[in-house]
Amino acid sequence: MKILVTGGAGFIGSHLVDRLVQEGYDVVVADNLSTGKRKNINRAANFYKVDIQGSGLDRVFRKERPTMVMHLAAQM
């Protein structure tokens, strides 16, 4: 199963990504890195630097075709 995690470079998102990778899922991360850090993202995950408010996320969906989305992206 392929899972897209928005906000996967943040504290909670990166820990979720690590766990999903550990469990054997194919993980895709979409994050604009406004508060998260690239170094937080598990190397086994496909990473896209993209703002979820823009059309860039559409390209991620078309290319990766995730089965599930876990939405953790937010601006505070």
Q: How does the language model describe each region?
A:
Residues M1-M76:
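N-terminal Rossmann-like NAD(P)+-binding domain of SDR-like oxidoreductases, especially those catalyzing
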